[in-house]
């Protein structure tokens, strides 16, 4: 069965180390790191003339959820071509949101995949 592995925890808790070690052990796997998307987010701050602050109301209102949507969309698409995908991202709000997790599991079920959360 296909799997989406979500390595999640608050920022700066060792997710990247754990994610990379797990990805090496499970190779072949599609590895997606939300930090890679930050380059795009930084540019949005510049274009909007906003100070770069990932805790700001501007970030919360205009960027945060789109980053998560983008990485999940990439992961779901990758499951069309690979049996395993690992996302390295905090997802701290999302894993506590029952409806969000149900929706994600439904999308994965349509792909013949299941969700594995590593906290």
Question: Which residue ranges define each predicted feature?
Answer:
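Pre-Walker A (Motif I) flank of P-loop NTPase domains
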Residues: 1-4, 82-83
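A glycine- and Lys/Arg-enriched "phosphate-lid" helix/loop adjacent to the NTP-binding pocket
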Residues: 52, 57-58, 108-119
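Conserved substrate/cofactor phosphate-moiety recognition/catalytic segment
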Residues: 20-70, 76
């Amino acid at each position: 069965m296909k799997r989406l592995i979500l390595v999640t925890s608050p920022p700066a808790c060792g997710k990247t180390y754990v994610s990379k070690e797990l990805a090496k052990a499970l190779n072949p796997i599609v590895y997606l790191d939300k930090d890679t998307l930050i380059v795009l987010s930084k540019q949005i701050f510049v274009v909007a003339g906003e100070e770069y602050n990932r805790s700001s109301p501007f970030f919360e209102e205009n960027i945060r959820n789109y980053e998560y949507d983008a990485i999940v969309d990439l992961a779901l698409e990758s499951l069309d071509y690979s049996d395993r995908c690992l996302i390295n991202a905090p997802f701290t709000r999302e894993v506590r949101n029952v409806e969000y997790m149900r929706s994600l599991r439904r999308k994965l079920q349509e792909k013949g995949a299941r969700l594995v959360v590593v906290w």
